[in-house]
Amino acid sequence: KDGYPVEVTGCKKSCYKLGENKFCNRECKMKHRGGSYGYCYFFGCYCEGLAESTPTWPLPNKSCGKK
């Protein structure tokens, strides 16, 4: 699947260099995520080819630190 991987807080992995981004690509390809490619889109790391089990934004009942 494709999407924004999330932190335990429910927030997207943030990034600042839009487009091709080494940090996002590395985050997406981490073994537990299984992604094939990652880049920075709307200041969040967007991943392609994630494992179905990888949590992606938005998470149900998690609003990125807001209550």
UniProtKB/Swiss-Prot annotation:
Keywords: Amidation, Disulfide bond, Ion channel impairing toxin, Neurotoxin, Secreted, Toxin, Voltage-gated sodium channel impairing toxin
Annotated localization: Secreted
GO biological process: defense response
InterPro entries in alphabetical order: LCN-type_CS_alpha_beta_dom, Scorpion_toxin-like, Scorpion_toxin-like_sf, Scorpion_toxinL, Scorpion_toxinL/defensin
Propiece residue ranges: 65-67
Residue numbers bearing the Cysteine amide modification: C64
UniProt entry tagged with the keyword Secreted: yes
UniProt superkingdom: Eukaryota
Annotated transmembrane regions: none
Ranges for domain LCN-type CS-alpha/beta: 1-65
GO molecular function: sodium channel inhibitor activity; toxin activity
Tissue spec. comment: Expressed by the venom gland.
Family the UniProt entry places it in: Belongs to the long (4 C-C) scorpion toxin superfamily. Sodium channel inhibitor family. Beta subfamily.
Function: Beta toxins bind voltage-independently at site-4 of sodium channels (Nav) and shift the voltage of activation toward more negative potentials thereby affecting sodium channel activation and promoting spontaneous and repetitive firing.
The protein's name in its UniProt record: Neurotoxin Cex9
